[in-house]
């Protein structure tokens, strides 16, 4: 796997004699070119810049960190939908052998969970969006005061999209929740229905755990076992609590 190297360079912000004679940042150079330089902060006498190696320096030129974060969030959202709906269906199955009751409870859990995930993600990301916009405006005002309006405008950068984050979270939850619904929602006998939900949920939990570990560079087998045990514990707890509640009332 190609590795991307980052280095922090401190350079003086005092005006240089000439742009043509100004030395480049002390970053990694090859073929007379410097890797991409991004200003991340401005102090009183110096600017802090991050130098990212491009493809010519063995870094591949592509930053996969943002993509990995989105994929990991999608895997976690799907895992939430899977465990929530499966536990809900198993819990309802503990007090009723009706296949229709299990199916309706699963659909209700899917809709409620997807809406909850979308709204929560929207509020969270929109708060982050507001914070980053406010920080960018403060940096722009500070730079204008230091440079008397002669400095170049800073790029807006990548700001999070609250609508995209909400849609992705709801979609991931829905995909995970559909698995136990499709596995056991239409099986009429009670025992095969519960077994189908448990089997499909277990297989999906192991797959989601291994995929999340692969995206994070961890051990897939260990992560799959951990997620699988957690899902089993959630389903067992839901079944036991509702069974006890039904016996008491």
Swiss-Prot record:
GO biological process, one term: intracellular manganese ion homeostasis
Disulfide cross-links: none
Top-rank taxon: Eukaryota
Coiled coil: none
GO cellular component: membrane; vacuolar membrane
Keywords of this entry: Ion transport, Iron, Iron transport, Membrane, Transmembrane, Transmembrane helix, Transport, Vacuole
Region span, Disordered: 1-32
Compositionally skewed regions (Pro residues) per UniProt: 16-26
GO molecular function: iron ion transmembrane transporter activity; manganese ion transmembrane transporter activity
Alphabetized Pfam families for the sequence: VIT1
KW Ribonucleoprotein (keyword) present: no
Reactions it catalyzes: Fe(2+)(in) = Fe(2+)(out)
Membrane topology, Vacuolar segments: 96-102, 188-193, 248-249
UniProt subcellular location: Vacuole membrane
Transmembrane feature ranges: 75-95, 103-123, 167-187, 194-214, 227-247
Residue spans, topological domain Cytoplasmic: 1-74, 124-166, 215-226
Membrane topology, as annotated: Multi-pass membrane protein
PANTHER family, per database record: FE(2+)/MN(2+) TRANSPORTER PCL1 (PTHR31851)
The family this protein is said to belong to: Belongs to the CCC1 family.
Biological role: Probable vacuolar iron transporter that may be involved in the regulation of iron distribution throughout the plant.
Protein name as it appears in the record: Vacuolar iron transporter homolog 3
Organism expressing this protein natively: Oryza sativa subsp. japonica
């Amino acid at each position: 796997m190609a590795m991307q190297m980052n280095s922090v360079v401190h350079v003086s912000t005092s005006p240089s004699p000439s742009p043509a004679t100004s030395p480049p940042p002390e970053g990694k150079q090859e073929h007379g070119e410097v890797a991409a330089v991004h200003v991340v902060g401005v102090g009183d006498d110096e600017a802090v810049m991050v130098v990212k190696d491009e493809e010519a320096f063995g870094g591949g030129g592509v930053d996969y960190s943002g993509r990995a974060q989105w994929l990991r969030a999608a895997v976690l959202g799907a895992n939430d939908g899977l465990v929530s709906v499966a536990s809900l269906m198993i819990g309802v199955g503990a007090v009723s052998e009706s296949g229709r009751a299990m199916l309706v409870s699963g659909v209700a859990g899917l809709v409620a969970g997807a809406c909850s995930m979308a709204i929560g993600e929207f509020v969270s990301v929109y708060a982050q969006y507001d914070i980053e916009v406010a920080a960018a405006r403060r940096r722009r005002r500070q730079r204008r005061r230091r440079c008397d309006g002669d400095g170049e405008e800073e790029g807006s950068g990548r700001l999070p999209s609250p609508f995209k984050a909400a849609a992705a979270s709801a979609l991931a939850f829905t995909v995970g929740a559909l698995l136990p619904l499709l596995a056991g929602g239409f099986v009429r006998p009670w025992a095969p229905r519960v077994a189908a939900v448990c089997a499909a949920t277990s297989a999906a939990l192991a797959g989601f755990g291994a995929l999340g570990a692969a995206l994070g560079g961890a051990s897939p087998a260990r992560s799959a076992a951990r997620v699988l045990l957690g899902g089993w514990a959630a389903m067992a707890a839901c079944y036991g609590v509702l069974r006890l509640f039904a016996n008491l009332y």
